[in-house]
Amino acid sequence: MENKKVIVGISGGVDSSVSALLLKQQGYDVTGVFMKNWEEDDTDEFCSAEQDIADAQAVCDSIGIPFKKINFTAEYWDNVFEHFLIEYKAGRTPNPDILCNKEIKFKAFLSYVHLLGGDYIATGHYAQTRLAADGSVQLVKGLDDNKDQTYFLYTLGQEQLRQTIFPIGNIEKSKVREIAKENNLVTFDKKDSTGICFIGERKFKEFLSKYLPAQKGEIHDENGIKIGMHDGLMYYTIGQRQGLGIGGVKDRPEVPWFAAKKDLENNVLIAVQGHDHPLLFKQSLQAIELSWVAGMAPADKFRCAAKVRYRQKDQSCEVEVNQDGSVNVTFDQPQRAITPGQSVVFYIDDVCLGGGVII
């Protein structure tokens, strides 16, 4: 451990702050690096980003480690944001956080860490690594089940995991804040960031409309009867209730409407009434662009658990790997609001096997 150099991604939040502190306490040679991934385009966002940088700098000064900044805005635009726009244009709902981990934090940043002569990269993710009996590295759920972030990390392979440390993966979130407070880190009570990394807290619709032209269209019920108008299919996600703008439809009960399907060919959004409407449920899905943590699927056909969204409880299923590398997943119980563009991630107990993109 002595003299092993660890470069920590410091975001200005409490998780990465405590990660850096713990590594320093464990005797590593630690450097904190702030990654700038987005050129702010409004004043509020600029102020928020400036605050994050100031907090990151303050934390590093307080711990007594060097602080650096690196700009990945070009890489982010090319490898994350453009893909994000293509997916939305195609009517799917992508997960940019997964792509950001794959392309920026564990690729561009990892290359930068090598340039700095770092032995390891560290982040404030709630995840763990474990050495398996065969010598491979497993990606394991964080101890705090409510905060586990392996769903966003399933694209990581052996090479990346061997060079990665997750210092807070075996700690509860409440304890992380406690450690920050005890050590007088300015971020101890900073609220967790929400929203997509580059949009921050802004209104999603407003943001997307700056980059993609929206085409308005009709909203139909499951029988093809027009019940309203939509602002553009890209603004809606399967299972969504808020913002459909359907209210008081003649001769219909006062039951909430939910987005159930996108008819891209005719630019029609299909909506149904009731949270548990059968059209919102599916028992199977197909996924492409598979990533397996171990480098390959466990078998051509296997049983495991899966999540189709972050923080969903593990769902029992059977996975069949096709010759082209895609998978068919059949769940024991029908799943609500399976969303094309989102990821399905597979687990056996607390080990993340990998995942893919739902089509």
Swiss-Prot record:
List, alphabetically, the Pfam families matched. Answer: tRNA_Me_trans, tRNA_Me_trans_C, tRNA_Me_trans_M
- Spell out the subcellular localization from the entry: Cytoplasm
Q: Where is this region: Interaction with tRNA?
A: 147-149, 309-310
**Recorded superkingdom:** Bacteria
Instruction: State if Membrane is listed as a keyword.
Output: no
Which portions of the sequence form the region Interaction with target base in tRNA? 95-97
Q: Principal place where this protein is found?
A: cytoplasm
Q: Which catalytic residues are annotated?
A: 100, 197
Q: Which GO terms describe its molecular function?
A: ATP binding; tRNA binding; tRNA-uridine 2-sulfurtransferase activity
* InterPro entries per record: MnmA-like, MnmA-like_C, MnmA-like_central, MnmA-like_central_sf, Rossmann-like_a/b/a_fold
The protein's UniProt keywords, in alphabetical order, are: ATP-binding, Cytoplasm, Disulfide bond, Nucleotide-binding, RNA-binding, Transferase, tRNA processing, tRNA-binding
Residues that hold ATP according to the record: 9-16, 35, 124
> Known catalysed reaction(s)?
S-sulfanyl-L-cysteinyl-[protein] + uridine(34) in tRNA + AH2 + ATP = 2-thiouridine(34) in tRNA + L-cysteinyl-[protein] + A + AMP + diphosphate + H(+)
Site feature: Interaction with tRNA: 125, 342
EC number(s) recorded for this UniProt protein:
2.8.1.13
Question: Which class of enzymes does this protein belong to?
Answer: transferase
Any GO BP: tRNA wobble position uridine thiolation
A cellular component term from Gene Ontology for this protein is: cytoplasm
Intrachain disulfide bonds: 100-197
What function does this protein fulfil?
Catalyzes the 2-thiolation of uridine at the wobble position (U34) of tRNA, leading to the formation of s(2)U34.
| Family indicated by similarity | Belongs to the MnmA/TRMU family.
Which NCBIfam families does the UniProt entry name for this protein? PRK00143.1, trmU
Name of protein: tRNA-specific 2-thiouridylase MnmA
Q: What organism is listed for this UniProt entry? A: Francisella tularensis subsp. holarctica (strain LVS)
**Organismal lineage:** Bacteria, Pseudomonadati, Pseudomonadota, Gammaproteobacteria, Thiotrichales
**Gene name, please?**
mnmA
